[in-house]
Amino acid sequence: MSVPTLSNKPENVDLLVLPHGEEKVKCQISDKGDCNIFTIKLEDHTIGNLIKQSLCQDPKVTFAAYRQPHPLQNAIEITIRPKGYAGVKLLSDNVHSILNQVSTLRETFANRVQKYKEKNAYHGNR
């Protein structure tokens, strides 16, 4: 018995590779003019939630949210209402902050693993 496939499911390559000439990030201004709406292609809830949480903690941001417009499209929209600051700069600063936090976490984890291995090497453990 075969498993039915989804006829509207995108090809795997479309979920991983940005087509030539397409932009990774696009910025629009909301109809009211008070929000920046960023569309980020080839990303999902993982990065969307991280960015939204970081923006919500930023005192220069009045409102931040994200959504995935359609479950079969590999893109997210991040909406930012800044307090008199450029939305592009706020997004960039917060993404760099997240990258620094992840880098610090990676280094700390690697150091702890190394210390654990050194400590347990004398006991004949892995």
Swiss-Prot record:
Keyword field contains GTP-binding: no
Source organism (scientific name): Plasmodium chabaudi chabaudi
Compartment(s) of residence: Nucleus
Protein family membership: Belongs to the archaeal Rpo11/eukaryotic RPB11/RPC19 RNA polymerase subunit family.
Protein name: Probable DNA-directed RNA polymerase II subunit RPB11
Pfam families: RNA_pol_L_2 (PF13656)
Keyword Protein biosynthesis: no
Keywords: DNA-directed RNA polymerase, Nucleus, Transcription
One GO location term (cellular component): RNA polymerase II, core complex
